[in-house]
C-alpha cells in the first residue's frame, strides 16, 4: 500500500467553453499527446450535433452534458472472495470515477462505430446517448442490471 495519497492534478478549462469537464473529455479522447487534434474532433462533433438536432432549444454543450449524464453509472459490481467463492458485490461509485467511466464509455463506443471520421462517430454517439440509446447507454444499463441481479450480496461491503 502506498504511503501518501497522491495530489489531485489541476486540469485547466478548455479555451472555447471555459469548462473543466470538456478538458477532461478531450484528455481521454487524445492519442499520442495530440491535444489540438482532440479539441478539433470534439468541437467538430459538437457542431455536427447542433446541425443534426436543430429544433433542440439546448446548446450543443448542454446536449453533450445531458448525454454524459445519461451514460453515467451510479453503481457497479466488484469481485470479492469470501470462503473460496467469488461474489459480485454491488458498490456505489465515487463521483470522480463516475465521470471518468462515462467519458471513457462514450469515447469507446464512438470509436467502435464503423466508417466515418471520429468527429462524426462521436457526434452520433452523443446524439444516441442524449436519446438514451447507443452502446454507452447500453453499457450503463448492463452495469445497473448486474448490480440489481447481485443485490443479495450487497452486505459483503468493502
Swiss-Prot record:
It holds the Pfam family Ribosomal_S7. One of its GO terms (cellular component) is small ribosomal subunit. InterPro entries: Ribosomal_uS7, Ribosomal_uS7_bac/org-type, Ribosomal_uS7_dom, Ribosomal_uS7_dom_sf. Gene3D superfamilies: Ribosomal protein S7 domain (1.10.455.10). One of its GO terms (molecular function) is structural constituent of ribosome. Belongs to the universal ribosomal protein uS7 family. Part of the 30S ribosomal subunit. Contacts proteins S9 and S11. PANTHER family: RIBOSOMAL PROTEIN S7 (PTHR11205). One of the primary rRNA binding proteins, it binds directly to 16S rRNA where it nucleates assembly of the head domain of the 30S subunit. Is located at the subunit interface close to the decoding center, probably blocks exit of the E-site tRNA. This is Small ribosomal subunit protein uS7. It comes from Phocaeicola vulgatus (strain ATCC 8482 / DSM 1447 / JCM 5826 / CCUG 4940 / NBRC 14291 / NCTC 11154) (Bacteroides vulgatus). The gene is rpsG.
